[in-house]
Curated annotation (Swiss-Prot):
CDD domains: Ribosomal_L7_L12. It comes from Corynebacterium aurimucosum (strain ATCC 700975 / DSM 44827 / CIP 107346 / CN-1) (Corynebacterium nigricans). Keywords: Ribonucleoprotein, Ribosomal protein. This is Large ribosomal subunit protein bL12. Homodimer. Part of the ribosomal stalk of the 50S ribosomal subunit. Forms a multimeric L10(L12)X complex, where L10 forms an elongated spine to which 2 to 4 L12 dimers bind in a sequential fashion. Binds GTP-bound translation factors. It comes from the Bacteria. One of its GO terms (molecular function) is structural constituent of ribosome. InterPro entries: Ribosomal_bL12, Ribosomal_bL12_C, Ribosomal_bL12_C/ClpS-like, Ribosomal_bL12_oligo, Ribosomal_bL12_oligo_N_sf. One of its GO terms (biological process) is translation.
Length: 128
């Protein structure tokens, strides 16, 4: 197998959907026995020393679909509206594979809007 350059890898990642990238990261973590979130956890562990302001400073949120509920079709439609460029098959797999992250690193307003839309469709959602 030919060795890919960093630029070639970046170009390949640009063509992937968020779901494909998420699955890639999970498989990468399993194969190499590493955690991509380890540095973030170390930073978050140091934050409480600054006082109780850590909650106020959080600017990025993950929207996690915990349960699709009884109305899966409505939830699939909502997921497709929230995640641009997502096909019907990918949205269905995402909903059926709950719990799954729908949005990662979203602003507070975007995360709350996505949560409201998913809950309106009948899903159970968490913001992390």
């Amino acid at each position: 197998m030919a060795k890919l350059t960093k630029d070639e890898l970046i170009e390949a990642f640009k063509e992937m959907t968020l779901i494909e990238l998420s699955e890639f990261v999970k498989e990468f973590e399993e194969v190499f026995d590493v955690e991509a979130a380890a540095p973030v956890a170390a930073v978050a562990a140091g934050a409480p020393a600054a006082g109780g302001a850590a909650e106020e400073e959080k600017t990025e949120f993950d929207v996690v679909l915990t349960d699709a509920g009884a109305k899966k079709i409505g939830v699939i439609k909502a997921v497709r509206e929230i995640v641009s460029g997502l096909g019907l098959k990918e949205a269905k797999e995402l909903v059926e594979g709950a719990p799954k992250a729908i949005l990662e690193g979203a602003s507070k307003d975007d995360a709350e809007a996505a949560k409201a839309k998913l809950e309106e469709a009948g899903a159970s959602v968490e913001l992390k």
